[in-house]
Amino acid sequence: MPFTISHVAAVVPFSRPLARWRLLSATIIGSMVPDFGFLMPWRPARIETHSAIALLTFCLPVGLATFWIFQRMIKTAVMEVLPDHTYSRWRPLAAPADLWSLKQWVLAALGILGGAITHLVWDAFTHEGARGVRMIPALDDPVVDIAGHRLMGARLLEDVSSLVGLAVVLVVIIYGLRRDSGPEEAPVRALRPRERHVWILTYAVTASLLAGLFLVMRRPSHVFGHSIAFMIGNIAIATLRGCAAALILVSVGLSVRLRANPFWSARNEST
């Protein structure tokens, strides 16, 4: 599969109108949600997560659950550890969604389905035997021979598009974190700078520990006893699991810490 986060690149060109319609977070979640099956302990079959029917049976329910977790547990916590200039610029866009509103859930469902469709279309042209590959026979032909291993056009397209997509996403993230909107007063924050740094470190350390734990929980022969590509895939999945679990667990802890802060509680009750 292309790197899961690379799929977000398909959403980037439409980020402004999506943000205007409050669809951005749901569409980003949707663009990655078919791959969430790889993060589950029981690993559902690909047809259960990457098919037209899976849009309704897997992508939509899992995407809506992820949307709730993001809005309720992750969004505000992550906002509070951002640098001041990024926090000031993104805060108007980071208002919690009205999770009691039917309209909000309809919009979230549309965003998730739209994002998931971009994922399935991308995969259709980058996986051997997929529908898009069957439509373009050249993608099913060998194009490169590496150490006696023939690399098909679809696989080459998968690797190249994954790297390009990942680069696009990283550039957008770095640009968003570094861009300065001009001189402005430093915002009043619920967390002091040193405490923000501690929480950022907590995210990183927790993700690393959990990724290592998920990796060692598998039999060594299942991780290292196959090809290099298979080994990299297992490491990538363990890393994704660790990052996802850390994002949820640490954000829950930070949310509890923030709710105990009178300033944060008063500020959020007024917005």
Q: What would you call each of these model-derived segments?
A:
Residues 1-271:
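N-terminal membrane-targeting hydrophobic helices
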